[in-house]
Amino acid sequence: MRNAHAPVDVAMIGFGAIGAAVYRAVEHDAALRVAHVIVPEHQCDAVRGALGERVDVVSSVDALACRPQFALECAGHGALVDHVVPLLKAGTDCAVASIGALSDLALLDALSNAADAGGATLTLLSGAIGGIDALAAARQGGLDEVRYIGRKPPLGWLGTPAEAICDLRAMAAEQTIFEGSARDAAQLYPRNANVAATVALAGVGLDATRVCLIADPAVTRNVHRIVARGAFGEMSIEMSGKPLPDNPKTSALTAFSAIRALRNRASHCVI
């Protein structure tokens, strides 16, 4: 049992836009101590320079000075295999933001098996979308249908298969660029898959969740909509998310979700 007066010893995996925002938010929390940061080798010197000697900055789990009580992943899909799996096996509870990677069943099984072997808990963060608590609760009574509709400005789809479907730089009207399962959406649009995968894993699964992705010149933000029906009734939730002030490609709510996970871990009353 944790000493009620001792701060929770935390390892952060990744120190990009989300990681830096999370660190700044909890840096002075008395109940939390971000004592470790894991980043790729080529980033270690820069992160050490930013954080100073008070944080153990390393490039692997094996290099950690001691085992943390809790780990937060906000580094991208590769970090799940490289860092989260060994931490779970060692008994460290982990929260992860890179949910889109879990469309790979082998990876999801590896994480689940590692958590089981280490007696640890793996928490999937809700990230950029709300309503996940309601959807997961509704699943207990049975869900008949779950749909996710994601809209982005056309230029938000650059570098994706949408470029072969329409001219993203000269759109005058909205166009659907994908319709299918959440699993297929995650495989075709991996950089845009976290929300669809989160909705799917909370609800009816990656194959039964229907996804529609839209390039829409009328929107200036990323817009997420969940529609579900089942024994609980019906729900429809839509969110228009702002980005982090210093990174227009990163959802502010994703960072806030990670901050909440850390503070919940240190709290004795959680909602």
Curated annotation (Swiss-Prot):
UniProt keywords (A-Z) are: NAD, NADP, Oxidoreductase, Pyridine nucleotide biosynthesis
- What InterPro entries is this protein classified in? Asp/hSer_DH_NAD-bd, Asp_DH, Asp_DH_prok, L-Asp_DH, NAD(P)-bd_dom_sf
| Active site location | H224
Top EC category: oxidoreductase
The pathway entry for this protein reads as: Cofactor biosynthesis; NAD(+) biosynthesis; iminoaspartate from L-aspartate (dehydrogenase route): step 1/1
Tell me yes or no: is Oxidoreductase among this UniProt entry's keywords. Answer: yes
- Amino acids binding NAD(+): A128, N194
What GO molecular function annotations does the UniProt record carry, in alphabetical order? aspartate dehydrogenase activity; NAD binding; NADP binding; oxidoreductase activity, acting on the CH-NH2 group of donors, NAD or NADP as acceptor
Q: Which domain of life is it from?
A: Bacteria
Q: What is its EC number?
A: 1.4.1.21
Cite a single GO BP annotation. Answer: NAD biosynthetic process
Alphabetical list of Pfam families matching this protein: Asp_DH_C, NAD_binding_3
Catalyzed reactions: L-aspartate + NADP(+) + H2O = oxaloacetate + NH4(+) + NADPH + H(+); L-aspartate + NAD(+) + H2O = oxaloacetate + NH4(+) + NADH + H(+)
* Miscellaneous notes: The iminoaspartate product is unstable in aqueous solution and can decompose to oxaloacetate and ammonia.
Q: Which family does it belong to?
A: Belongs to the L-aspartate dehydrogenase family.
Task performed by this protein: Specifically catalyzes the NAD or NADP-dependent dehydrogenation of L-aspartate to iminoaspartate.
NCBIfam families in the cross-refs: PRK13303.1-1, PRK13303.1-2, PRK13303.1-3
Would you tell me the protein name for this molecule? L-aspartate dehydrogenase
> What is the native source organism of this protein?
Burkholderia mallei (strain ATCC 23344)
Identify the taxonomic lineage of the organism of origin.
Bacteria, Pseudomonadati, Pseudomonadota, Betaproteobacteria, Burkholderiales
Q: Which gene encodes it?
A: nadX
